[in-house]
Every structure is written in C-alpha cells, then in structure tokens.
Amino acid sequence: MRSFRASIFGLTGLILVPLLACQPLSAYAQAAPTEPTPVQLMMNALANANAAVVGIRVSAADGARSAETLGQRRNGSGVLIGEDGLVLTIGYLLLEAEQIEIVTQDNKTVPARAVAYDLATGFGLLRPLLPLPKEIAEHIVALGDTRELKPGEALMAVTGPQPNNDGDIAMTRLVSKRAFSGTWEYHIESALFTSPPITVSGGNHSGAPLFNQKGELIGIGSLLVADASGADKKQPGNMFVPVDLLRPILAEMQQSGMSQKSRRPWLGVTSSDQGGRVQVLRVSKGGPAQLAGLRAGDVVMAVDGVPVATLETFYKKVWDRASPDAEITLTVRQGDEVKSIVLKAEDRMLTLKKPASI
C-alpha cells in the first residue's frame, strides 16, 4: 500500500511551502489548539482524495476491434465518485470489455461491470459487483471546477494500484488549458495539460485522477503528451479530461450508458495535423473509410465541399449531421490525384462489442 504522507512530504516544494508562505504568523497564533490549520485541512483533503483512488484491470472481448490499438488486456486507474460505488475512469479502458476488476490499495480485486462509455467526452463509469472495502467506500471525492485554474497551479495526480505495483502519488503543475483534437476522431474544447508527467509504470496513468488543493477531482488522465505547453519548446506531460464536461451528462450516462452527443458519424480513420493539412495515418479494418477506398497517406482537403485544414475543422464538419449514418463526401489527395470519395458513416457506439450491462 502506498504511503500518502511519505509521498506528500517529499513534494512540499510544490504546494505546502507556497501555502505556508501565504499565511501570516498571526493566523496560527490566534488559532485554538484544536482548530486545524490551513495546511492540515489541505493535507486531510488530499489524503481523502488519495484513499478514493483504485486500480482497474480489463480484459477485452474476443474479436474486439479496439484490441488492435488498445490491447486485449488493459491496466489503468479510477476514482470513487458515488456512494453506490460509482467509479470514474477514462472510457477507452472499458471499450468492449469482457471482464473488469477493481484493484484496491491492499492489492485485492473486486469484480466490476461497465456502466457507461461516453465517446464524446472520453469518460467511462463502472461499479463493483461486490461491496468495496470500507477503507475505500468511505472516501468519496467531490467534483471540482476548472474555470478558475491558472497555469502554474500545483495539483496532485494519483495512479491506482495493480498487482505488484502500489501506484504512485505525483505533484504536478497546470501548464495550459486549451482545445485538444485526438487522432482517433475526438475533440474537446478545454483539456488540462500538466507537467512534469506522472508515473507511467504499467500504464496506470490512463484514468488517473487529478486533484486540486482542496482534494476535489478536476480531471481524468487520458494521454502522455510531448507538448504539454502547446508552445514550440517541447515540454512532456499529461492531458486530462476536465470533470466540467462530466457534470452535465453524469445522470444521462448512468441512465443511457452514454450522452446523446456520442451518437455521431464515425469514419474509422486515424489522422493528424500536418502543417495545415489533415493526413490519414491509418484506416480501421472494415470501417467506413476503408470500405470507401481511403488509404493511409491520403490528405483530406474538404468535407462536403467545405475546406478543412485541421483535425478540429475536419471532425466538426463530419459531426455536423443529424444522423450518425449519413453519407459524407470527402475530397482527398491520393498520391498525385485529387478524388471525391463518398462514404456512409457509422454510429461508432453500434460497432462496439458491449457487455450485457450496457
């Protein structure tokens, strides 16, 4: 079991020292002996947050498409957000899951089931099939608010345990808040980027919770990135999905297994921004793009006649349809030729193998 105090006191330069420097001595002189100091309150809040973190182990179903990129077996982290055992994690861990286990901080496992996967935000929800141990169940974290976060603010990220791996606690700083477009047909407007990067041992950074100094949950770990600052100078770090995106859809996710925004056209392409153009890196086997004749190396120039030069404009134009299975015309450069390729998009959520619980 990881030692919270040993970890936190070794990292006081990020949070505790600045906090102490901001407190006048009179604040401590006037406090009653039994009244907790601001530092003690912060330590208690972060200790509660740390205790709510769990590990997650997933085995994907046989024949799962997602196994090609995510693997058949996946490890990650999650955090308890509900009295009924509801755990929040990053959704790609749960894609086409056949078996899910929660790993407690004393390295015991509890079987779990997927509750939701939200394609639009990337969040995933799960619940244990058996009661969680009391030392975890009594520690539930509140959702914070990232609107007031400022670059440079000290934060705490925690990775969940795995067998033979106790997880880790890392102090990090917010580097930037900005829009993020993923290569896998994904875009959010307000991703959180932190540095230095948190521990990557065993892949536990996937789903790792990010906490503010009040012990409130503000983000869920998605990726390791080489450019956390977004500037020319490379600064390795992590991208977290902000919980601000969860709050308005949490009830819908629990009821329907996803938000309505997840029902959108999917092409089955992995693409990247390449100096003012959108280049296809790969196409999913059997997906709409492959069936229509798109190939790796193609450059997407327009969607339905509207020029696109970034992943963001590409995705938003594709998603601007009333039906997820709409016909879409792509203008692409394929080698030395410019072609118009018509494809029939799919509802990504209908292509995934799902356990009976969703």
Language-model features: locations:
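N-terminal activation segment of mature serine protease catalytic domains
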Residues: 27-92, 99, 150-157, 251-252, ...
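Bacterial N-terminal signal peptides
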Residues: 10-23
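PDZ/PDZ-like groove recognition
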Residues: 193, 197-200, 252-317, 333, ...
